[in-house]
Regions:
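P-loop NTPase motor domains
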Residues: 1-173
Length: 173
């Protein structure tokens, strides 16, 4: 749990730092995986983003072995998003002239995502993100948005653990 929790701090710091510089998610993941923990943390600090630096301040003076373990846990979580070409293409930062999907797209469009059973192991992390972000969007919809949204998940149990309890609590009936 220690490595996972602190690895998430590194990821959060990188996302805040580099997204604020205009980078896309895939570019951030590739940069993250392309650097050791020392190079990554030094580069984040060099950007002088105070919010990003708050997330990594706990690594100052920490054991190098523990910090490397945290980075490895984070690398394991991000590998799919930096190495799989189909995922990279789906999640890349869209050009301004390209259509893209956001949770708000669900207000006016039908979106179908089909993943064959044999690919669930590979794309499970992506499906968990899509599900969690959609649920978060549903729970924060403004009250004036009255149109009902039907959200169906086939084989929900095969997704594994989803962190959606908080979003479900906030959903309107």
């Amino acid at each position: 749990i220690f490595f996972t929790k602190n690895g998430r701090k590194m990821i959060t710091a990188a996302l805040i730092c580099y997204y604020g510089m205009g980078w896309g998610f895939v570019q951030i993941c590739e940069f993250f995986l392309g650097h050791d923990w020392r190079g990554l943390l030094n580069d984040i600090v060099k950007q002088q983003n105070p919010i990003a630096n708050m997330f990594i301040s706990s690594f100052v003076g920490a054991s190098e072995q523990n910090t490397a373990g945290c980075k490895q846990a984070a690398d394991d979580a991000l590998k799919l998003f930096a190495a799989n070409e189909k995922i990279k293409n789906a999640l890349r930062k869209s050009a301004s002239y390209e259509q893209s999907i956001s949770p708000a797209t669900l207000e006016t469009n039908s979106v179908y995502i089909y993943i064959p059973d044999e690919k669930l192991k590979i794309y499970g992390d992506l499906l968990r993100i899509i599900t969690a972000q959609s649920m978060e969007y549903f729970s924060s919809r403004p009250p004036e948005h009255k149109k009902m949204i039907l959200f169906c998940l086939d084989e929900f149990a095969s997704f594994g653990k989803l962190q959606i309890t908080e979003a479900l609590r906030k959903l309107r009936k």
